[in-house]
Amino acid sequence: MKERTYICCDLKSFYASVECIERGLNPLDTNLVVADLSRTEKTICLAVTPSLKSYGISGRARLFEVIQRVKEVNAQRQRNTPGRQFTGASSHDPEVRRNPSLALDYIVAPPRMAHYIDWSTRVYSVYLKHVAPEDIYPYSIDEVFIDATSYLQTYHLSAREFARKIILDILQTTGITAAAGIGTNLYLAKVAMDIGAKHVPADEYGVRIAELDEMGYRRSFWTHRPLTDFWRVGKGYAAKLEANGLYTMGDIARCSIGQPTDYHNEELLYKLFGVNAELLIDHAWGWEPCTIADIKAYKPENKSIVSGQILQYPYPFEKARLVIQEMADALALELVDKRLATNQLVLTVGYDIENLKGTAYTGEVTTDRYGRKIPKHAHGTVNLDGYTSSGEELLKAATSLYDRIVDKTLLARRLTLCANHLLDESSVPEDLPEQIDLFTDYSAKEKQKKEADTAHARERKLQETMLDIKKRFGKNAILKGLNLEDGATARERNNQIGGHKA
Protein backbone atom coordinates (compact mmCIF):
# COMPACT_ATOMS: atom_id res chain seq x y z
CA MET A 1 0.00 0.00 0.00
CA LYS A 2 1.35 3.43 -0.97
CA GLU A 3 2.45 5.58 1.96
CA ARG A 4 0.17 8.57 2.27
CA THR A 5 0.94 12.14 3.24
CA TYR A 6 -1.50 14.12 5.36
CA ILE A 7 -1.49 17.78 6.31
CA CYS A 8 -3.37 19.16 9.31
CA CYS A 9 -3.89 22.93 9.08
CA ASP A 10 -4.97 25.08 12.01
CA LEU A 11 -5.81 28.79 11.88
CA LYS A 12 -3.89 30.53 14.65
CA SER A 13 -6.22 31.99 17.33
CA PHE A 14 -8.91 32.11 14.64
CA TYR A 15 -11.67 34.17 16.32
CA ALA A 16 -9.14 36.59 17.81
CA SER A 17 -7.37 36.94 14.45
CA VAL A 18 -10.64 37.85 12.74
CA GLU A 19 -11.36 40.51 15.36
CA CYS A 20 -7.85 41.98 15.01
CA ILE A 21 -7.93 42.05 11.21
CA GLU A 22 -11.30 43.79 11.17
CA ARG A 23 -9.89 46.44 13.51
CA GLY A 24 -6.89 46.96 11.23
CA LEU A 25 -4.57 45.34 13.80
CA ASN A 26 -1.91 42.65 13.47
CA PRO A 27 -3.15 39.41 15.13
CA LEU A 28 0.42 38.42 16.01
CA ASP A 29 1.28 41.49 18.11
CA THR A 30 -2.09 42.71 19.44
CA ASN A 31 -3.30 41.71 22.90
CA LEU A 32 -6.95 40.67 22.43
CA VAL A 33 -9.39 38.13 23.82
CA VAL A 34 -12.77 37.09 22.44
CA ALA A 35 -15.20 36.93 25.36
CA ASP A 36 -18.72 38.03 26.23
CA LEU A 37 -18.43 40.85 28.79
CA SER A 38 -22.21 40.83 29.26
CA ARG A 39 -21.80 37.56 31.15
CA THR A 40 -19.92 37.11 34.42
CA GLU A 41 -16.13 37.13 34.65
CA LYS A 42 -16.34 33.33 34.78
CA THR A 43 -17.20 33.33 31.06
CA ILE A 44 -14.73 31.43 28.92
CA CYS A 45 -12.48 33.22 26.44
CA LEU A 46 -13.13 31.72 23.02
CA ALA A 47 -9.75 32.88 21.70
CA VAL A 48 -6.62 34.64 22.91
CA THR A 49 -4.02 36.21 20.60
CA PRO A 50 -0.48 34.72 20.63
CA SER A 51 1.08 37.85 22.14
CA LEU A 52 -1.29 37.73 25.13
CA LYS A 53 -0.69 33.98 25.53
CA SER A 54 3.01 34.77 25.89
CA TYR A 55 2.24 36.23 29.34
CA GLY A 56 1.14 32.81 30.58
CA ILE A 57 -2.54 33.03 29.67
CA SER A 58 -4.19 29.86 28.39
CA GLY A 59 -5.93 29.81 25.03
CA ARG A 60 -9.17 28.77 26.78
CA ALA A 61 -8.87 30.80 29.97
CA ARG A 62 -11.79 32.18 31.93
CA LEU A 63 -12.08 35.97 31.73
CA PHE A 64 -11.29 36.37 35.43
CA GLU A 65 -8.04 34.45 34.87
CA VAL A 66 -7.04 36.93 32.14
CA ILE A 67 -7.88 39.88 34.41
CA GLN A 68 -5.93 38.35 37.29
CA ARG A 69 -2.85 37.50 35.20
CA VAL A 70 -2.72 40.97 33.58
CA LYS A 71 -2.91 42.53 37.07
CA GLU A 72 0.03 40.37 38.16
CA VAL A 73 2.07 41.33 35.08
CA ASN A 74 1.32 45.03 35.60
CA ALA A 75 2.18 44.83 39.30
CA GLN A 76 5.59 43.41 38.38
CA ARG A 77 6.09 46.01 35.62
CA GLN A 78 5.11 48.84 37.95
CA ARG A 79 7.75 47.81 40.48
CA ASN A 80 10.38 48.18 37.74
CA THR A 81 9.00 51.47 36.36
CA PRO A 82 10.74 54.77 37.19
CA GLY A 83 8.65 56.49 39.86
CA ARG A 84 6.49 53.35 40.00
CA GLN A 85 3.85 55.14 37.94
CA PHE A 86 2.53 54.17 34.51
CA THR A 87 2.24 56.94 31.92
CA GLY A 88 -0.35 55.02 29.90
CA ALA A 89 -1.46 51.61 28.69
CA SER A 90 -1.34 49.78 25.37
CA SER A 91 -2.68 46.62 23.78
CA HIS A 92 0.07 46.77 21.11
CA ASP A 93 2.55 44.25 22.51
CA PRO A 94 5.81 45.50 20.90
CA GLU A 95 5.08 48.96 22.30
CA VAL A 96 4.47 47.53 25.78
CA ARG A 97 7.71 45.55 25.69
CA ARG A 98 9.70 48.58 24.48
CA ASN A 99 8.30 51.03 27.01
CA PRO A 100 8.37 49.94 30.70
CA SER A 101 6.22 52.95 31.70
CA LEU A 102 3.22 51.52 29.81
CA ALA A 103 0.76 49.15 31.46
CA LEU A 104 -0.17 45.96 29.66
CA ASP A 105 -3.68 46.34 28.27
CA TYR A 106 -5.89 44.16 26.10
CA ILE A 107 -9.03 44.39 23.97
CA VAL A 108 -12.11 42.32 24.84
CA ALA A 109 -14.05 41.56 21.65
CA PRO A 110 -17.58 40.12 21.93
CA PRO A 111 -18.01 36.86 20.00
CA ARG A 112 -19.73 36.92 16.59
CA MET A 113 -20.19 33.27 15.69
CA ALA A 114 -22.07 33.71 12.40
CA HIS A 115 -19.34 36.09 11.26
CA TYR A 116 -16.63 33.55 12.08
CA ILE A 117 -18.49 30.94 10.04
CA ASP A 118 -18.40 33.33 7.06
CA TRP A 119 -14.65 33.77 7.52
CA SER A 120 -14.19 30.00 7.81
CA THR A 121 -16.01 29.62 4.49
CA ARG A 122 -13.60 32.10 2.91
CA VAL A 123 -10.63 30.10 4.19
CA TYR A 124 -12.18 26.84 2.95
CA SER A 125 -12.44 28.39 -0.53
CA VAL A 126 -8.65 28.88 -0.41
CA TYR A 127 -8.15 25.18 0.35
CA LEU A 128 -10.33 24.36 -2.66
CA LYS A 129 -7.96 26.30 -4.92
CA HIS A 130 -5.31 23.68 -4.17
CA VAL A 131 -7.16 20.49 -3.18
CA ALA A 132 -10.35 18.70 -4.27
CA PRO A 133 -13.17 18.58 -1.67
CA GLU A 134 -12.98 14.77 -1.41
CA ASP A 135 -9.41 15.13 -0.07
CA ILE A 136 -10.36 17.66 2.63
CA TYR A 137 -11.94 16.82 5.98
CA PRO A 138 -13.03 19.90 8.01
CA TYR A 139 -12.31 18.86 11.60
CA SER A 140 -13.60 22.09 13.13
CA ILE A 141 -14.34 25.70 12.19
CA ASP A 142 -10.61 26.50 12.14
CA GLU A 143 -8.95 23.16 11.40
CA VAL A 144 -8.84 20.77 8.43
CA PHE A 145 -7.12 17.56 7.39
CA ILE A 146 -5.85 17.28 3.82
CA ASP A 147 -4.79 14.11 2.01
CA ALA A 148 -1.91 15.60 0.03
CA THR A 149 -0.62 12.30 -1.40
CA SER A 150 -1.69 12.76 -5.01
CA TYR A 151 -0.90 16.50 -5.15
CA LEU A 152 2.81 16.45 -4.38
CA GLN A 153 3.74 14.91 -7.71
CA THR A 154 1.25 17.11 -9.57
CA TYR A 155 2.70 20.32 -8.11
CA HIS A 156 6.29 18.97 -8.00
CA LEU A 157 6.53 20.05 -4.37
CA SER A 158 7.54 18.45 -1.10
CA ALA A 159 4.87 18.10 1.60
CA ARG A 160 6.40 21.03 3.50
CA GLU A 161 6.47 23.22 0.38
CA PHE A 162 2.86 22.31 -0.45
CA ALA A 163 1.68 23.07 3.10
CA ARG A 164 3.52 26.39 3.07
CA LYS A 165 2.02 27.28 -0.32
CA ILE A 166 -1.51 26.80 1.06
CA ILE A 167 -0.78 28.64 4.31
CA LEU A 168 0.72 31.66 2.53
CA ASP A 169 -2.32 31.77 0.23
CA ILE A 170 -4.57 31.87 3.31
CA LEU A 171 -2.42 34.66 4.77
CA GLN A 172 -2.49 36.68 1.55
CA THR A 173 -6.24 36.17 1.01
CA THR A 174 -7.51 36.67 4.57
CA GLY A 175 -4.66 37.99 6.71
CA ILE A 176 -4.89 34.96 9.02
CA THR A 177 -1.77 32.99 9.94
CA ALA A 178 -1.97 29.20 10.06
CA ALA A 179 0.20 26.37 11.37
CA ALA A 180 0.52 22.90 9.86
CA GLY A 181 1.47 19.39 10.84
CA ILE A 182 2.55 16.83 8.25
CA GLY A 183 2.34 13.10 8.91
CA THR A 184 2.19 9.70 7.28
CA ASN A 185 -1.25 9.21 8.85
CA LEU A 186 -3.98 11.45 10.27
CA TYR A 187 -2.87 10.96 13.87
CA LEU A 188 0.75 11.88 13.20
CA ALA A 189 -0.32 14.97 11.23
CA LYS A 190 -2.45 16.06 14.17
CA VAL A 191 0.32 15.47 16.74
CA ALA A 192 2.83 17.27 14.51
CA MET A 193 0.55 20.30 14.46
CA ASP A 194 -0.68 20.22 18.07
CA ILE A 195 2.71 19.58 19.71
CA GLY A 196 5.50 19.62 17.14
CA ALA A 197 4.65 22.94 15.46
CA LYS A 198 4.67 24.73 18.83
CA HIS A 199 8.39 23.99 19.20
CA VAL A 200 9.35 25.00 15.65
CA PRO A 201 10.63 28.56 15.12
CA ALA A 202 8.22 30.70 13.10
CA ASP A 203 9.36 31.96 9.71
CA GLU A 204 9.17 35.60 8.60
CA TYR A 205 5.39 35.24 8.14
CA GLY A 206 4.78 33.65 11.53
CA VAL A 207 4.21 30.23 9.91
CA ARG A 208 5.14 27.04 11.77
CA ILE A 209 5.25 23.61 10.08
CA ALA A 210 6.29 20.31 11.70
CA GLU A 211 6.65 16.83 10.15
CA LEU A 212 6.37 13.34 11.68
CA ASP A 213 6.62 9.72 10.63
CA GLU A 214 6.24 6.70 12.93
CA MET A 215 9.90 6.45 13.93
CA GLY A 216 10.22 10.21 14.38
CA TYR A 217 7.13 10.15 16.59
CA ARG A 218 8.62 7.45 18.79
CA ARG A 219 11.96 9.22 19.08
CA SER A 220 10.47 12.64 19.83
CA PHE A 221 7.22 11.96 21.67
CA TRP A 222 7.47 8.67 23.54
CA THR A 223 8.79 10.61 26.53
CA HIS A 224 6.61 13.71 26.08
CA ARG A 225 4.49 14.88 28.98
CA PRO A 226 1.72 15.64 29.78
CA LEU A 227 -0.36 12.95 28.09
CA THR A 228 -3.23 15.41 27.69
CA ASP A 229 -1.25 17.14 24.93
CA PHE A 230 -2.03 14.18 22.69
CA TRP A 231 -5.13 13.96 20.51
CA ARG A 232 -8.04 12.18 22.24
CA VAL A 233 -6.32 11.89 25.63
CA GLY A 234 -8.39 13.92 28.07
CA LYS A 235 -7.93 14.49 31.78
CA GLY A 236 -9.96 11.38 32.65
CA TYR A 237 -7.84 9.11 30.44
CA ALA A 238 -4.61 10.64 31.74
CA ALA A 239 -5.68 10.25 35.39
CA LYS A 240 -6.48 6.54 34.87
CA LEU A 241 -3.20 5.92 33.09
CA GLU A 242 -1.10 7.74 35.67
CA ALA A 243 -2.88 5.95 38.52
CA ASN A 244 -1.54 2.75 36.94
CA GLY A 245 2.01 4.00 36.47
CA LEU A 246 1.70 5.00 32.80
CA TYR A 247 2.89 8.57 32.25
CA THR A 248 3.95 8.72 28.59
CA MET A 249 3.04 7.28 25.20
CA GLY A 250 6.23 5.20 25.48
CA ASP A 251 4.91 3.70 28.72
CA ILE A 252 1.64 2.79 26.99
CA ALA A 253 3.47 1.22 24.03
CA ARG A 254 5.64 -0.87 26.37
CA CYS A 255 2.58 -1.85 28.38
CA SER A 256 0.88 -3.14 25.21
CA ILE A 257 3.66 -5.71 24.64
CA GLY A 258 4.01 -6.78 28.28
CA GLN A 259 3.86 -10.47 29.17
CA PRO A 260 0.64 -11.92 30.64
CA THR A 261 2.51 -12.34 33.93
CA ASP A 262 3.49 -8.64 34.02
CA TYR A 263 1.31 -6.05 35.74
CA HIS A 264 1.69 -3.76 32.73
CA ASN A 265 0.27 -5.66 29.78
CA GLU A 266 -2.33 -5.25 27.05
CA GLU A 267 -5.05 -6.74 29.25
CA LEU A 268 -4.62 -3.89 31.76
CA LEU A 269 -5.34 -1.32 29.04
CA TYR A 270 -8.48 -3.16 27.89
CA LYS A 271 -9.60 -3.45 31.51
CA LEU A 272 -9.22 0.32 31.93
CA PHE A 273 -10.67 1.50 28.61
CA GLY A 274 -12.57 -1.40 27.00
CA VAL A 275 -12.56 -1.39 23.19
CA ASN A 276 -11.11 2.15 23.21
CA ALA A 277 -7.81 0.61 24.34
CA GLU A 278 -7.21 -0.55 20.76
CA LEU A 279 -7.13 3.05 19.51
CA LEU A 280 -4.96 4.16 22.44
CA ILE A 281 -2.43 1.40 21.73
CA ASP A 282 -2.35 2.23 18.01
CA HIS A 283 -1.73 5.89 18.79
CA ALA A 284 0.99 5.04 21.31
CA TRP A 285 2.87 3.35 18.47
CA GLY A 286 2.05 6.13 16.00
CA TRP A 287 -0.39 4.01 13.99
CA GLU A 288 -3.69 5.18 12.48
CA PRO A 289 -5.29 3.10 9.70
CA CYS A 290 -8.27 5.42 9.15
CA THR A 291 -8.17 7.61 6.02
CA ILE A 292 -10.17 10.66 4.95
CA ALA A 293 -12.04 8.41 2.50
CA ASP A 294 -12.98 6.13 5.43
CA ILE A 295 -14.28 9.10 7.43
CA LYS A 296 -16.40 10.37 4.55
CA ALA A 297 -17.80 6.86 3.89
CA TYR A 298 -18.70 6.23 7.55
CA LYS A 299 -22.40 5.80 8.32
CA PRO A 300 -23.25 5.53 12.03
CA GLU A 301 -25.52 2.65 13.06
CA ASN A 302 -27.51 4.88 15.38
CA LYS A 303 -28.36 8.53 14.88
CA SER A 304 -29.19 11.06 17.57
CA ILE A 305 -29.68 14.79 18.07
CA VAL A 306 -28.39 16.40 21.25
CA SER A 307 -29.39 19.75 22.70
CA GLY A 308 -27.43 21.09 25.65
CA GLN A 309 -26.85 24.33 27.50
CA ILE A 310 -25.06 25.74 30.52
CA LEU A 311 -27.38 28.07 32.41
CA GLN A 312 -26.18 31.61 33.15
CA TYR A 313 -26.75 31.08 36.87
CA PRO A 314 -28.01 28.21 39.09
CA TYR A 315 -31.68 27.48 38.37
CA PRO A 316 -34.15 26.13 40.94
CA PHE A 317 -36.22 23.07 40.05
CA GLU A 318 -39.22 24.83 38.45
CA LYS A 319 -37.15 27.22 36.32
CA ALA A 320 -34.93 24.43 35.01
CA ARG A 321 -38.08 22.41 34.27
CA LEU A 322 -39.29 25.26 32.05
CA VAL A 323 -36.00 25.26 30.11
CA ILE A 324 -36.25 21.49 29.58
CA GLN A 325 -39.73 22.03 28.11
CA GLU A 326 -38.33 24.67 25.76
CA MET A 327 -35.56 22.29 24.72
CA ALA A 328 -38.02 19.46 24.05
CA ASP A 329 -40.21 21.73 21.94
CA ALA A 330 -37.19 22.99 19.95
CA LEU A 331 -35.97 19.41 19.51
CA ALA A 332 -39.34 18.44 18.04
CA LEU A 333 -39.15 21.30 15.52
CA GLU A 334 -35.65 20.19 14.52
CA LEU A 335 -36.91 16.65 13.96
CA VAL A 336 -39.78 17.93 11.78
CA ASP A 337 -37.38 20.13 9.81
CA LYS A 338 -35.10 17.15 9.12
CA ARG A 339 -38.00 14.74 8.53
CA LEU A 340 -36.87 12.49 11.39
CA ALA A 341 -38.62 10.72 14.26
CA THR A 342 -37.42 9.38 17.62
CA ASN A 343 -38.59 6.75 20.08
CA GLN A 344 -36.32 7.57 23.03
CA LEU A 345 -35.27 10.63 25.05
CA VAL A 346 -32.23 10.80 27.33
CA LEU A 347 -31.94 13.60 29.90
CA THR A 348 -28.92 14.68 31.95
CA VAL A 349 -29.08 17.46 34.54
CA GLY A 350 -25.84 18.69 36.11
CA TYR A 351 -26.08 20.38 39.50
CA ASP A 352 -24.27 23.54 40.65
CA ILE A 353 -21.49 23.73 43.25
CA GLU A 354 -23.68 26.14 45.26
CA ASN A 355 -25.68 23.10 46.40
CA LEU A 356 -22.86 22.05 48.75
CA LYS A 357 -22.40 25.43 50.41
CA GLY A 358 -23.98 25.48 53.86
CA THR A 359 -26.57 22.80 53.09
CA ALA A 360 -27.42 19.46 54.59
CA TYR A 361 -27.04 17.61 51.29
CA THR A 362 -26.14 13.98 51.99
CA GLY A 363 -26.40 12.47 48.51
CA GLU A 364 -23.63 11.20 46.27
CA VAL A 365 -20.87 13.72 45.50
CA THR A 366 -18.51 13.79 42.52
CA THR A 367 -15.69 16.06 41.28
CA ASP A 368 -15.95 18.33 38.24
CA ARG A 369 -13.17 19.04 35.72
CA TYR A 370 -11.89 21.89 37.91
CA GLY A 371 -11.53 19.62 40.95
CA ARG A 372 -14.58 21.07 42.73
CA LYS A 373 -17.05 18.92 44.65
CA ILE A 374 -20.60 18.87 43.23
CA PRO A 375 -23.66 16.64 43.67
CA LYS A 376 -23.68 13.77 41.18
CA HIS A 377 -25.70 14.63 38.07
CA ALA A 378 -29.18 13.23 37.38
CA HIS A 379 -29.47 10.97 34.34
CA GLY A 380 -32.41 9.07 32.90
CA THR A 381 -34.04 7.60 29.81
CA VAL A 382 -37.64 7.35 28.65
CA ASN A 383 -38.81 5.07 25.85
CA LEU A 384 -41.76 6.42 23.87
CA ASP A 385 -44.72 4.36 22.69
CA GLY A 386 -43.59 4.72 19.09
CA TYR A 387 -41.62 6.93 16.73
CA THR A 388 -42.70 10.56 16.82
CA SER A 389 -41.70 14.16 16.16
CA SER A 390 -44.70 15.58 18.01
CA GLY A 391 -43.78 18.53 20.21
CA GLU A 392 -46.65 17.73 22.54
CA GLU A 393 -45.49 14.13 23.04
CA LEU A 394 -41.81 14.99 23.44
CA LEU A 395 -42.55 17.85 25.85
CA LYS A 396 -44.76 15.59 27.96
CA ALA A 397 -42.18 12.78 28.00
CA ALA A 398 -39.25 15.11 28.80
CA THR A 399 -41.18 16.82 31.61
CA SER A 400 -42.21 13.48 33.13
CA LEU A 401 -38.62 12.22 32.96
CA TYR A 402 -37.32 15.45 34.52
CA ASP A 403 -39.82 15.21 37.39
CA ARG A 404 -38.80 11.59 37.99
CA ILE A 405 -35.00 11.91 38.10
CA VAL A 406 -34.22 15.45 39.34
CA ASP A 407 -33.80 16.38 43.01
CA LYS A 408 -36.27 19.22 43.65
CA THR A 409 -34.09 20.70 46.39
CA LEU A 410 -30.99 21.19 44.21
CA LEU A 411 -29.98 23.98 41.83
CA ALA A 412 -29.35 22.98 38.21
CA ARG A 413 -26.58 24.39 35.98
CA ARG A 414 -26.17 22.05 32.97
CA LEU A 415 -28.99 20.57 30.90
CA THR A 416 -28.67 18.02 28.09
CA LEU A 417 -31.56 16.45 26.18
CA CYS A 418 -30.94 13.81 23.54
CA ALA A 419 -33.32 12.24 21.00
CA ASN A 420 -32.07 8.73 20.22
CA HIS A 421 -32.69 6.01 17.62
CA LEU A 422 -33.59 8.50 14.89
CA LEU A 423 -35.23 7.25 11.72
CA ASP A 424 -36.26 8.99 8.53
CA GLU A 425 -40.03 9.42 8.62
CA SER A 426 -40.29 7.27 5.49
CA SER A 427 -38.55 4.42 7.37
CA VAL A 428 -40.74 4.44 10.49
CA PRO A 429 -42.30 0.95 10.80
CA GLU A 430 -46.05 0.51 10.53
CA ASP A 431 -48.07 -0.45 13.60
CA LEU A 432 -47.63 -4.13 14.39
CA PRO A 433 -50.62 -6.50 14.01
CA GLU A 434 -52.59 -6.81 17.23
CA GLN A 435 -54.04 -9.96 18.80
CA ILE A 436 -57.84 -9.60 18.87
CA ASP A 437 -59.69 -10.38 22.11
CA LEU A 438 -63.36 -10.38 23.15
CA PHE A 439 -63.08 -7.68 25.81
CA THR A 440 -61.80 -4.70 23.79
CA ASP A 441 -64.15 -2.16 22.25
CA TYR A 442 -62.42 -1.89 18.87
CA SER A 443 -64.84 0.69 17.50
CA ALA A 444 -64.02 3.03 20.42
CA LYS A 445 -60.32 2.27 20.00
CA GLU A 446 -60.50 3.05 16.27
CA LYS A 447 -62.30 6.29 17.05
CA GLN A 448 -59.55 7.27 19.53
CA LYS A 449 -56.90 6.49 16.92
CA LYS A 450 -58.61 8.66 14.30
CA GLU A 451 -58.89 11.52 16.79
CA ALA A 452 -55.21 11.15 17.70
CA ASP A 453 -54.21 11.06 14.00
CA THR A 454 -56.26 14.21 13.36
CA ALA A 455 -54.63 15.97 16.33
CA HIS A 456 -51.16 14.90 15.13
CA ALA A 457 -51.87 16.14 11.61
CA ARG A 458 -53.08 19.48 12.99
CA GLU A 459 -49.98 19.81 15.20
CA ARG A 460 -47.71 18.84 12.31
CA LYS A 461 -49.21 21.55 10.11
CA LEU A 462 -48.67 24.07 12.91
CA GLN A 463 -45.04 22.93 13.36
CA GLU A 464 -44.32 23.28 9.64
CA THR A 465 -45.92 26.74 9.60
CA MET A 466 -43.77 27.81 12.56
CA LEU A 467 -40.65 26.50 10.82
CA ASP A 468 -41.51 28.41 7.67
CA ILE A 469 -41.99 31.66 9.62
CA LYS A 470 -38.74 31.16 11.56
CA LYS A 471 -36.75 30.51 8.38
CA ARG A 472 -38.17 33.55 6.61
CA PHE A 473 -38.20 36.10 9.44
CA GLY A 474 -35.86 34.75 12.13
CA LYS A 475 -36.13 32.27 14.98
CA ASN A 476 -37.74 34.81 17.31
CA ALA A 477 -40.41 35.84 14.78
CA ILE A 478 -42.83 33.39 16.39
CA LEU A 479 -42.65 32.16 19.98
CA LYS A 480 -44.76 30.16 22.39
CA GLY A 481 -46.03 31.41 25.73
CA LEU A 482 -43.51 29.33 27.67
CA ASN A 483 -40.68 31.18 25.86
CA LEU A 484 -41.84 34.42 27.52
CA GLU A 485 -41.90 33.11 31.09
CA ASP A 486 -39.32 34.14 33.70
CA GLY A 487 -36.19 32.01 33.33
CA ALA A 488 -36.87 30.93 29.74
CA THR A 489 -33.73 30.88 27.58
CA ALA A 490 -34.99 30.13 24.05
CA ARG A 491 -35.30 33.76 22.91
CA GLU A 492 -31.70 34.52 23.88
CA ARG A 493 -30.36 31.23 22.51
CA ASN A 494 -32.11 31.86 19.19
CA ASN A 495 -29.62 34.70 18.72
CA GLN A 496 -26.65 32.45 19.48
CA ILE A 497 -24.55 29.83 17.72
CA GLY A 498 -22.94 27.20 19.93
CA GLY A 499 -24.08 29.07 23.04
CA HIS A 500 -22.37 32.33 22.01
CA LYS A 501 -23.55 35.50 20.28
CA ALA A 502 -24.16 34.98 16.58
Please annotate each region the language model reported.
Residues I209-L212, L227, I305, V382, ...:
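Short clusters of hydrophobic/aromatic residues that line enzyme substrate/ligand-binding pockets
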Residues C8, D229, Y237-A412, S427, ...:
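DNA-contacting surface of Y-family translesion DNA polymerases
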Residues M1-I292, S443-A502:
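Gly/Gly-Pro- and Ser/Thr-rich, intrinsically disordered tail segments characteristic of DNA damage-repair
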Residues T177-A179, V346, T416:
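Residues at or immediately flanking beta-strands
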Residues K12-F14, S38-K42, Y351-L356, L422-S426:
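Short, charged/polar surface micro-motifs in flexible loops or helix N-caps
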Residues K42-A47, V207-A210, G358-T359, H377, ...:
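Short, well-ordered strand-loop elements centered on a beta-strand within folded domains, enriched
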Residues V18, G371-A502:
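Acidic, metal-coordinating catalytic segment for phosphate/diphosphate chemistry
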